[in-house]
């Protein structure tokens, strides 16, 4: 009896950028930044600086958009459907800041530590400081190996533990499984393993209110504070000199060599979640490896 994947409302796309970076980190090769592959180029921010190839970037940033969905009206009740990204995409469907502040009400130095891609923009004849990139706290993230058993449509997940059988493998016939056949969501019963990490992205009340303020400025009302695409990005922090509304200068960290590693298409309206939101995204191995029957 086959098991069926449960659709959780999100679509995840691993990018070519992610595979290139992974290969560089595995082999010790220089990290490459092909032209038109960075979020710096998409947002036209910090494009003059590129990290040295020997610098080791890691996932630690995110940006958002509001065009990662369509409305399906083929039924009586309209459905909001996420739109997947191509693995060779390097920008966003839309350009939406996470924060917009009037010139006389910029983020504090402490608040600014959580953001990057700071730029001055004019919206409706008024000037604002816009922030398009948010740093993700990766300190609690750890990799996990999962041992997954599906039997009669019921899935059991536990930590994978290496044994003497893995340390001293013997030749045997491996199960035949076509990983390239993605034409069906039916997953056969059996045993699988995967390695990855659960990345929790919390949206605090501060984050939600800032994004609702962005929507109110851009659209005249915060009612449709929609996020329907998230890019999880790698990059490198670099010191930068900013200027306040009064012309005084200050130092803060910007981000260069920012590349999308994962795109998440979803649909959420922060005006409805109101004060907070938490997303858990599994990153790492795109699909589990089939080991054969559960016995």
Model-derived features: where do they sit?
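Long, position-biased, composition-driven segments near the start of the mature protein
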Residues: 1-295
């Amino acid at each position: 009896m086959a098991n069926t994947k449960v659709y959780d409302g999100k679509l995840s796309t691993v990018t070519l950028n992610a595979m290139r970076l992974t290969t560089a980190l595995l082999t010790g090769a220089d990290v490459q930044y092909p032209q038109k592959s960075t979020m710096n180029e998409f947002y036209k921010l910090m494009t003059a600086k590129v990290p040295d190839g020997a610098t080791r970037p890691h996932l630690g940033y995110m940006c958002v958009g509001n065009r990662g969905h369509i409305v399906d009206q083929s039924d009586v009740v309209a459905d909001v459907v996420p739109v997947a990204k191509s693995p060779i995409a390097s920008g966003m469907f839309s350009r939406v800041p996470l924060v917009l502040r009037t010139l006389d009400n910029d983020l504090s130095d402490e608040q600014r530590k959580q953001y990057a891609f700071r730029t001055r923009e004019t919206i409706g004849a008024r000037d604002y400081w816009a922030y398009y990139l948010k740093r993700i706290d990766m300190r609690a993230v750890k990799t996990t190996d999962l041992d997954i058993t599906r039997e009669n449509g019921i899935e059991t997940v536990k930590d994978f533990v290496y044994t003497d059988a893995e340390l001293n493998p013997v030749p045997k016939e491996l199960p035949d499984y076509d990983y390239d056949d993605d034409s069906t969501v039916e997953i056969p019963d059996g045993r699988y393993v995967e390695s990855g990490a659960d990345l929790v992205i919390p949206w605090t009340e501060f984050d939600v209110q800032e994004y609702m303020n962005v929507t109110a400025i851009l659209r005249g009302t915060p009612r449709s504070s929609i996020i329907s695409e998230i890019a999880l990005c790698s990059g490198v922090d670099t010191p930068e000199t900013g200027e306040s509304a009064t012309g005084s200068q200050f130092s803060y960290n910007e981000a260069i060599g920012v590349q999308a590693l994962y795109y998440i298409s979803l649909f959420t309206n922060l005006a409805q979640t109101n004060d907070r939101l938490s997303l858990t995204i599994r990153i790492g191995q795109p699909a589990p490896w089939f080991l054969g029957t559960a016995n």
